[in-house]
Structure formats: structure tokens, C-alpha cells
Curated annotation (Swiss-Prot):
Lineage, broadest ranks: Eukaryota, Metazoa, Chordata, Craniata, Vertebrata
Cellular component terms (Gene Ontology): apical plasma membrane; cell surface; plasma membrane
The protein's role, per its UniProt record: Receptor for Wnt proteins. Most of frizzled receptors are coupled to the beta-catenin canonical signaling pathway, which leads to the activation of disheveled proteins, inhibition of GSK-3 kinase, nuclear accumulation of beta-catenin and activation of Wnt target genes. A second signaling pathway involving PKC and calcium fluxes has been seen for some family members, but it is not yet clear if it represents a distinct pathway or if it can be integrated in the canonical pathway, as PKC seems to be required for Wnt-mediated inactivation of GSK-3 kinase.
Species: Xenopus laevis (African clawed frog)
Expression by tissue: Expression restricted to the early nervous system.
Compartment(s) where it occurs, according to its Swiss-Prot or TrEMBL record: Membrane; Cell membrane; Cell surface; Apical cell membrane
Disulfide bonds: 27-88, 35-81, 72-109, 98-132, 102-126
Protein name: Frizzled-3
Designated gene of the protein: fzd3
Residues of the signal peptide: 1-16
Record-annotated membrane-spanning stretches: 205-225, 237-257, 288-308, 328-348, 374-394, 420-440, 477-497
Region ranges (Disordered): 537-664
Chain intervals with Polar residues compositional bias: 549-564, 573-585
A single MF term (Gene Ontology): G protein-coupled receptor activity
Length: 664
């Protein structure tokens, strides 16, 4: 009783699957020569072994022909015919062969099958069939219902849908599907392109990946040379570059691997062709997918965070330190969201090999995965990023127009806005092209697949599409454009860090010099004192400019210089005296007789007051060094004791020579 129940459930499930994917079926006369002399003459297709017609069933029975011709068992031919061309008892009802019939055929022909190298298929295991009292359906049952009635057509032309060829079938444990059919995988090489086209595309992707890898690696190394140079709001550019550096690295690895990871090897002995790798059973393919998908999504999220930091700096006027306090939240979002999506795809077993680029990704053959895990995140990032970017640029432009700034700050602000605009365009244009390619691919995927089935149905011995109205093949340029724009997206980061300062940093790095701490020009625009006051002040409050001790023409004023000199502490005055002494000693030249003379005598004479040259006698020249040391020592003590001493103007050389002439 239990065996009958299991058999009934098995047949019901198979019929339910057929009714969901195909049209209604009908009884049809048996055309197989091997099954012509049986007590029944009509069968039901498709059968229990997923053969959609009798021609396909005949091809599947060919390996058993030697055993049937040698008559290893008189029950083998009835058993095969009952399984491959089952008797049609009623419309939509099939009768399974009995277990005893299967066991006798297997026991008597097993050794001969081993000799011919013919395996006993798993779907023909005797335990799957019911334990009948009679090994075969009774003739009475066959004669009553074997002839087709007027209500049941003998055969109709109908749409069978896609049936997976034997060459493309895979292990059921892999839980993969192709064109809606389980345990089936797409063929390798690619379904739509020739081998020479695939070879050209692979080299094209390899060259572009090297260019992108070089650009993003240069950006990252520039950041490592001077970590303090790139702070918020522009720090996300570095992480954005790191993401696309990893993306380009994975594509370069795929170029080196060719299709060794993206495709499963062929097995001619089991009639298995090379198929696309699907699922997480291939560890190398899984690793390539995880890194590629994770960093692709993380790169787009970091671009959104970059627009957020620009928005915070331009609209609410946040400073670099305030934005940097949110760095933990930025990192949690940029790495957490892609990580969650990657884990979900791993759990759903949506990994697919790409036999064009040699990597593994998602949505290459599954339109639903492409729509929800690739297109949706990218479109959301573009909408949010563009909105924040436009808001920030509009705010900065309003500052430039409404608030009066110095010409230098105006130029810096305009330059900063231009850099933001150019960088955003260089990112958005390739990304929008990639999204457009994905939308086009999603819209025409069904037409391409139908065309492929139409062209290969006779080769694979599967049913051809019924009433095909549109056929089309994809152009290789579409896929090349998609891969090109996907990699070019990472190159704009090098334009942001590319400047004269970067060249100086690399030159200093190669020469082993330590670079002085500086402020990046793009960040300095938002931190300029006058510019920051203009951003943070009340629009109705007038701007009060404070003097820094120098005029706009760059000339020193007497009042400001004197005031700054009077406010210096004693330590700075002592250092000033030391600098005077060292300056004078540096300007003296020692002659052969041991005397020290000024190096530029003519220049000193021109700078001295009228009549002062007459006091520079030979005696004063001999003792100038001695008096200089004594007067410098006395002057330094006198200066330290009187903090409000008068500071004379002129160069240190003039002051020292004037004092020497007076004492003489």
C-alpha cells in the first residue's frame, strides 16, 4: 500500500510540473520500432523520464539496444517500453512498470551491461516502482483503454517549452536552473558568441582592468604617502578608489584564469558538455563573486557617502572635524550594506560564472537576481547621490553669488566647484551607461534565449519553440561597453588626487625627504578664515576684515611691525640676537693674513649712510670681530633687561656695521 501511495505521489508531482510548464498532452500512437509488438499501441508524452516526444525517448534507449538484441532477458524490452513509452490508460493517466519486472531485467542483464559499459540509470532504480502482483498491466485494462477515443486527439502540435538537453544536465544537489528548468546549466563557451569574439572580449577586458588597476592603485598609494592630506569631506574618494581597485583586480584575475573557474569541465563519457558554473560548490568561483560583488556595491555606496560629506560641508556648514566624527557610521554603512547583500545571495545560491570575463557574478542568466540585486541598488545610489550633489553645488553657488569674498577665495571656490562637477560627471556617465546596458539586457534576454533555442533545438534533440515571432542575437559591442564602463568608473579618482602637490610628494618620497604638513587646497577652500566666516555669519551682519600685519599689496607697515616686535617674548629676542650674529659672521670673509672682511664690500657701501665709510679704518677692521662679539653680548643683555627696547629697522648687516663705525 505504501509503495502504491509513493508511486501515485511521484506521478502526480511529475504531471503537475509538466502542466505548469507546458501545454496539455494527449495519447499518441507508438512509433518506436522496439515497442511495436507489445500488447498496447498508444503512449503518453512526455514520459516519466522527461522525454518530450518519442524521438527523444528512442535516443535515450539506444544504449540498451545491444542487450535487447542479445536477449539477455525477455523482460528487458517490456520493461524499457513500459518506462520510455508508458501505456496510456486514460487521458492524463500513466501506469508504471512493476518492481518485479524491473528486478528480473536488472539481475539478468547486469553483467552484460557492465561488459558494454552501460550504467543502470538512477531513474530506473527498481525501488522506485510499485510492488505489483502482476509484473505488467493486464491485457484487459490495455484493450479497454488502449484505443484513442474521439475526444482524445492522437497528437497535437503544441508549445513544449524548454526541455533541458542531456548534455546540459547537472547534479541535482547543485540546485541550479536554466531557463526555468531545474538541474540544468547554460553551455560553455557563451551561448551567443563565437570563440574568436570571446577571445577578443577577454583581452579587451584584461587591458581595461590593468588601466583601472594602475589608476586606483596610484590613488591609494598617494594617500598612504601623506595620510593627513586627504581628510573629510574628501576622504571617501580614497575608499572609493580602493573598492574599484579590488574590482579591477578581480577582472584581471579572471582574464588570467580564462574560463577555468567560470565553466565546468566537459565529461564526454557521460555525455556531459561544458556548462556554466552555478551555485557555491566551486570555491574559487564563490571567492571571485564575493569580492567582485561586495566591492562593486561598496564603491557605489562610498560615492553616495562622498556626496553626503560634500552636502554636510556646503549646506549645514559642517567642519572637517564634525564630519570625521561620523566616520564610524559611514564605514558601517559602506561595508555593512554590501556585506548583507552578498550573504543573501550566497544563501540563495545565485552565483553564476561569466564565460566572457572569466569571473563570477550575479544576474548573468537570472533576470530576477539582476533586477533586485544589481539594478535596484545602483539606481538607488544614483538617485540619492545626484540629489545631494545638486543640493551642495547650489548652496556653494549661492555663497559665491550672495556673499562678498576676496578674489582669491572666489577663485578657489569656483575651482573647487568645477572639480566636484568634473569628478561627478566622470563617475555618473559610465555608471549610467552600465545601468542602461543592464536594462537593455533585461528587456531582450527572453528574445535572445528563444533565438538560441530555435538555432540549437535540433542539435540538442529538444523541442523547438512554437510560433516564434521575433528572433534576435545580442551584439558584442553591448557587452564590451558594459565591461568598459564598469571599470572606467574607478578611474576618476586619479583626477582628484592629480596635482602639482602630488608630484612633489612622489618626488620627495623617492628622494627620501620628509614632506612638511600642509592643507589640501580643496579642503582649504572650506576652511579659509574669511570664507568660513562668510559661511557661518548672519547674512544681515556686515563683514569686518581684520589686519594680519601685512597689507594686500604685501608691504610691511611700520606700526604693525613695531607692535609685533614689542609683544615678542624674551626668548624670541634672544634668538633674534643670535640670528644677527650668525648673519654677520656668514657675510664675512677671512683673508690670508687672518683678517675678516665683508664679502660684498661694494654692496655694503651702497647701503651705508653718507660718511660712514670714513670710520672703517684698518684698525677697526682688525678689531671688528672682537668688538662685534663684545657688543653683541652686551646688546643681548641690554635687550633682555629692557623688553620695550626700540627695534631699529634695516638689515642685520647694516645695524652691525653702523655700531662698529660709531664705536670707532
Amino acid at each position: 500500500m505504501a509503495a502504491y501511495l509513493i508511486s501515485f505521489i511521484w506521478v502526480s508531482v511529475i504531471l503537475a510540473q509538466k502542466s505548469m510548464g507546458h501545454s496539455l498532452f494527449a495519447c499518441e500512437p507508438i512509433t518506436l520500432r522496439m515497442c511495436q509488438d507489445l500488447p498496447y499501441n498508444s503512449t503518453f508524452m512526455p514520459n516519466l523520464l522527461n522525454h518530450y516526444d518519442q524521438q527523444t525517448a528512442a535516443l535515450a534507449m539506444e544504449p540498451f539496444h545491444p542487450m535487447v538484441n542479445l536477449e539477455c532477458s525477455r523482460d528487458l524490452r517490456p520493461f524499457l517500453c513500459a518506462l520510455y513509452t508508458p501505456v496510456c490508460m486514460e487521458y492524463g493517466r500513466m501506469t508504471l512498470p512493476c518492481r518485479k519486472l524491473c528486478q528480473r531485467a536488472y539481475n539478468e542483464c547486469f553483467k552484460l551491461m557492465e561488459m558494454f559499459g552501460v550504467p543502470w540509470p538512477e531513474e530506473m532504480e527498481c525501488s522506485r516502482f510499485p510492488d505489483c502482483d502482476e509484473p505488467y498491466p493486464r491485457i484487459v485494462d490495455i484493450s479497454l483503454s488502449g484505443e484513442p477515443s474521439e475526444e482524445t486527439p492522437l497528437a497535437v502540435q503544441r508549445d513544449y517549452g524548454f526541455w533541458c538537453p542531456r548534455e546540459l544536465k547537472i547534479d541535482p544537489d547543485l540546485r541550479s536552473s536554466f531557463l526555468g528548468v531545474r538541474d540544468c546549466s547554460p553551455p560553455c563557451p557563451h551561448m551567443y558568441f563565437r570563440r574568436e569574439e570571446l577571445s577578443f572580449a577577454r583581452y579587451f577586458i584584461g587591458v581595461i582592468s590593468i588601466v583601472c588597476l594602475s589608476a586606483t592603485l596610484f590613488t591609494f598609494l598617494t594617500f598612504l604617502i601623506d595620510v593627513t592630506r586627504f581628510r573629510y569631506p574628501e576622504r571617501p574618494i580614497i575608499f572609493y578608489a580602493v573598492c574599484y581597485m579590488m574590482v579591477s583586480l578581480i577582472f584581471f584575475i579572471g582574464f588570467l584564469l580564462e574560463d577555468k573557474v567560470a565553466c565546468n569541465g566537459a565529461n564526454p563519457s557521460q555525455y556531459k558538455a561544458s556548462t556554466v558554473t552555478q551555485g557555491s560548490h566551486n570555491k574559487a568561483c564563490t571567492m571571485l563573486f564575493m569580492v567582485l560583488y561586495f566591492f562593486t556595491m561598496a564603491g557605489s555606496v562610498w560615492w553616495v557617502i562622498l556626496t553626503i560629506t560634500w552636502f554636510l560641508a556646503a549646506v549645514p556648514k559642517w567642519g572637517s572635524e564634525a564630519i570625521e566624527k561620523k566616520a564610524l557610521l559611514f564605514h558601517a554603512s559602506a561595508w555593512g550594506i554590501p556585506g548583507t547583500l552578498t550573504i543573501i545571495l550566497l544563501a540563495m545560491n545565485k552565483i553564476e560564472g561569466d564565460n566572457i570575463s572569466g569571473v563570477c557574478f550575479v544576474g548573468l542568466y537570472d533576470v530576477h537576481a539582476l533586477r533586485y540585486f544589481v539594478l535596484a541598488p545602483l539606481c538607488l545610489d544614483v538617485v540619492v547621490g545626484v540629489s545631494l550633489l545638486l543640493a551642495g553645488i547650489i548652496s556653494l553657488n549661492r555663497v559665491r553669488i550672495e556673499i562678498p569674498l576676496e578674489k582669491e577665495n572666489q577663485d578657489k571656490l569656483v575651482k573647487f566647484m568645477i572639480r566636484i562637477g568634473v569628478f561627478s560627471i566622470l563617475y555618473l556617465v559610465p555608471l549610467l551607461v552600465v545601468i542602461g546596458c543592464y536594462f537593455y539586457e533585461q528587456a531582450y534576454r527572453g528574445v535572445w534565449e528563444t533565438t538560441w533555442v530555435q538555432e540549437r533545438c535540433r542539435e540538442y534533440h529538444i523541442p523547438c519553440p512554437y510560433k516564434v515571432t521575433q528572433t534576435s542575437r545580442p551584439d558584442l559591442i553591448l557587452f564590451l561597453m558594459k565591461y568598459l564602463m564598469l571599470l572606467v568608473v574607478g578611474i576618476p579618482s586619479v583626477f582628484w588626487v592629480g596635482s602639482k602637490k602630488t608630484c612633489f610628494e612622489w618626488a620627495s618620497f623617492f628622494h627620501g625627504r620628509k614632506k612638511k604638513a600642509g592643507v589640501n587646497e580643496s579642503r582649504q577652500v572650506l576652511q579659509e578664515p574669511d570664507f568660513a566666516q562668510s559661511l557661518l555669519r548672519d547674512p544681515n551682519t556686515p563683514i569686518v576684515r581684520k589686519s594680519r600685519g601685512t597689507s594686500t599689496q604685501g608691504t610691511s607697515t611700520h606700526a604693525s611691525s613695531t607692535q609685533l616686535a614689542m609683544l615678542d617674548d624674551q626668548r624670541s629676542k634672544a634668538g633674534s640676537v643670535q640670528s644677527k650674529v650668525s648673519s654677520y659672521h656668514g657675510s664675512l670673509h677671512r683673508s690670508r693674513d687672518g683678517r675678516y672682511t665683508p664679502c660684498s664690500y661694494r654692496g655694503i657701501e651702497e647701503r651705508l649712510p653718507h660718511g660712514s665709510m670714513s670710520h672703517l679704518t684698518d684698525h677697526s677692521r682688525h678689531s671688528s670681530t672682537h668688538r662685534l662679539n663684545e657688543q653683541s653680548h652686551q646688546g643681548s643683555i641690554r635687550d633682555l633687561s629692557n623688553p620695550l627696547a626700540h627695534i631699529s629697522h634695516g638689515t642685520s648687516m647694516n645695524r652691525v656695521i653702523e655700531a662698529d663705525a660709531t664705536s670707532a
